């Protein structure tokens, strides 16, 4: 889209918001790229009172709520832990490419687990972190939604 098209779209969004909530103060509008659908996974961290930060991996989106098919490790993790977390979920065949679906980039998912583990080590103030969903593709992965809670 051109700069003029973006400006016109911004004006429409602001006008619509003010129509629905006349007293609203609007400081800006978030614009982000729409990503193509991929295999949905979740990566999360919670703090256990006894063990400290615990990393979670599983199928994402609504599947995590329905299937509760997740793996956990205490932070920090190493490459072997990341590989095992991915391979031990029941949904692993989906990540390998099931019934004609493209396989997910397992190396990128392992790297993402390791990066989240390192991030949590470097930022002990993070109480919770959720990347859900992460779209896994044959050649990469991208977090589409994220939530971080700071203590």
Kindly give the residue locations of the regions a language model identified.
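ATP-dependent carboxylate/acyl-activation modules
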Residues: 1-151
């Amino acid at each position: 889209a051109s700069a003029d098209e973006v400006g016109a779209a911004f004006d429409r969004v602001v006008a619509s918001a003010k129509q629905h909530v006349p007293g609203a103060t609007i400081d800006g509008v978030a614009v982000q790229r729409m990503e193509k659908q991929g295999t949905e996974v979740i990566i999360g961290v919670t703090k256990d009172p006894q063990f400290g930060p615990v990393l979670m991996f599983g199928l994402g989106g609504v599947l995590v709520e329905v299937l509760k098919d997740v793996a956990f490790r205490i932070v920090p993790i190493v490459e072997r832990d990341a590989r095992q977390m991915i391979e031990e979920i029941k949904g692993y065949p989906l990540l390998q490419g099931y019934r004609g679906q493209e396989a997910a980039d397992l190396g990128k998912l392992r790297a993402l687990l390791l990066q989240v583990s390192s991030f949590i080590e470097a930022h002990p103030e993070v109480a919770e972190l959720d990347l859900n969903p992460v779209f896994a593709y044959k050649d990469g992965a991208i977090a589409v939604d994220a939530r971080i809670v700071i203590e």
